[in-house]
């Protein structure tokens, strides 16, 4: 009888990047006889704690003990989907045969600086290359995010409403207050605003100046799982380039995403949703301003601020009609 494999996946951060690993994890679990373990940071545990395709999760909260714990597992393979100094050190310490995702540094440089796109595919497809040695095939079932249905949130999620993630790692990745306000003013459905603590005041100002009085500010008030639950039950999800976009993609709900300094051409757009998805780009060029969106070559505050509110509204109506 053939021995069951034991495979360790590594991805430390962040929300979207971890969610984007889930098709590879699922396909490995279903296509080979293997125990699947996953190493990530403690603060991202909730993203995968309910994932039925992962047998054990290790959390990188104590580096003094994690190496000995992993050594005891006796892994056959390591699939490194982060490929940074820390993950490379772990591979060195464990001395296990490993396969790492390519960071495509040259290709990213050519795209950002010269508009030459040699990436030409989604990052999920790049992740799948790490398991070619196991003859793993993409089942094309998209992303996985398992959220418990019993989450209790003080909101009537059974009614029709829109969810809108107004956050972003950098100001240059966020729509402005007035852009959002101008859209919300003309939307008849209730709207929930989602983001972290940093956007609380941002959301409050939108509510203060908007004519639409059916807006709920959940910024900084919900866990990732609770936010995911609201997104899952909404009729449409609007978002900047955020990790929550990938969670929404796993639920196969309609998505409108907004792109400024980053661009879908980098390969991190919503992956394989079965419902409608519209990527709205500020500059009709496939050349990103920067890798993570911290710098804009067109406007100090970010070229995302040039996306017309009336076009956003048109796309909302297009999806909902």
Regions found by a protein language model. Give the residues of each.
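Conserved nucleotide-sugar phosphate-binding/catalytic loop shared by glycosyltransferases and other
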Residues: 35-66, 277-284
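Nucleotide-sugar donor-binding patch of glycosyltransferase catalytic domains
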Residues: 101-107, 214-218, 249-320
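A short, glycine/small-residue-rich beta-strand->loop->alpha-helix junction that serves as a flexible
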Residues: 10-20, 47, 80, 169-176
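Conserved nucleotide-diphosphate donor binding/catalytic pocket of glycan-assembly enzymes
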Residues: 58-144, 161-165, 262-265, 271
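Surface-exposed amphipathic alpha-helices with a cationic face
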Residues: 22-32, 184-185, 232
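Nucleotide-sugar donor-binding and catalytic loop/hinge architecture
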Residues: 1-5, 149-162
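Donor-binding and catalytic core of enzymes assembling or modifying cell-surface/extracellular glycoconjugates
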Residues: 172, 176-261
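Short amphipathic alpha-helix
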Residues: 18-28, 43-46
């Amino acid at each position: 009888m053939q021995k069951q494999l034991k495979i360790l996946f590594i991805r430390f951060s962040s929300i979207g990047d971890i969610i984007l690993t889930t098709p590879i994890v699922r396909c490995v679990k279903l296509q080979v006889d293997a125990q699947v373990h996953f190493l990530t940071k403690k603060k991202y545990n909730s993203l995968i704690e309910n994932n039925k395709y992962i047998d054990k999760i290790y959390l990188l909260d104590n580096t003094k003990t994690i190496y000995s714990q992993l050594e005891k597992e006796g892994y056959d393979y390591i699939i490194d989907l982060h490929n940074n100094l820390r993950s490379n050190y772990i591979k060195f310490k464990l001395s296990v045969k490993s396969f790492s995702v390519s960071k495509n540094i040259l290709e990213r440089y050519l795209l950002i600086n010269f508009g030459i796109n040699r990436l030409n595919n989604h990052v999920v497809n790049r992740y799948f290359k790490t398991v070619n040695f196991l003859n793993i095939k993409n089942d094309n079932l998209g992303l996985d995010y398992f959220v418990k249905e019993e989450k209790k949130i003080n909101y009537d999620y059974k009614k029709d409403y829109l969810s809108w993630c107004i956050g972003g790692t950098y100001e240059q990745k966020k729509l402005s207050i007035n852009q959002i306000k101008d859209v919300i003013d003309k939307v008849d459905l209730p709207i929930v605003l989602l983001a972290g603590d940093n956007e609380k005041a941002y959301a409050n100002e939108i509510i203060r100046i908007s004519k639409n009085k059916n807006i709920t500010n959940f910024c900084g008030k919900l866990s990732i799982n609770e936010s995911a639950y609201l997104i899952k039950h909404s009729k449409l999800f609007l978002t900047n380039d955020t990790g929550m976009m990938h969670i929404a993609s796993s639920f196969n709900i309609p998505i409108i995403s907004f792109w400024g300094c980053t661009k879908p051409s980098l390969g991190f757009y919503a992956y394989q949703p079965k419902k409608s998805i519209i990527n709205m780009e500020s500059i009709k060029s496939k050349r990103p301003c920067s890798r993570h969106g911290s710098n804009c070559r067109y406007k100090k505050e970010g070229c995302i601020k040039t996306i017309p509110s009336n076009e956003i509204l048109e796309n909302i109506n297009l999806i909902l009609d």
